[in-house]
Amino acid sequence: KGIIVCMTRTQDADVTKACRVQLANTAGANLFVSIHCNTSDAWDTSANGLECLYATNKKALAAQNKKLAKTILHSLTKTTRLKKRGVIKRNGLYILRKAKIPSTIVEVGYLSNKKDLKTIIKESGQNAIAQGISDGIIQALEGNR
């Protein structure tokens, strides 16, 4: 689809939040999507599903952030069939607070939940997650034209 992806890392090495945000802000990117695995307090195995986090602290980006989060979550729910927990406003998270472009953190499931974990670790689940996120990004970019 002609989309250029800029990865913050390609190996299992720690990259600081500040470095990730700086890369997104200086790379000429249109969107910043940070992908995470969730876990619950005390490893509560009942918590499960997908979430997309967004920030409203920058008024110029607030609506775009929420729309990006909703679009990716909707697409991801279709491809993974995991529970849709919703979009959640989180102004205190460094990555979302410091991004100067539309951004979201995508929580792709709970490591503490057996069903979610199975999706996260299986290649077919990883492909479904990747497809859902990429479909959502494409929809978000097409909606911004």
Regions found by a protein language model. Name each.
Residues K1-R145:
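Active-site-proximal helix/loop segments of hydrolytic enzymes
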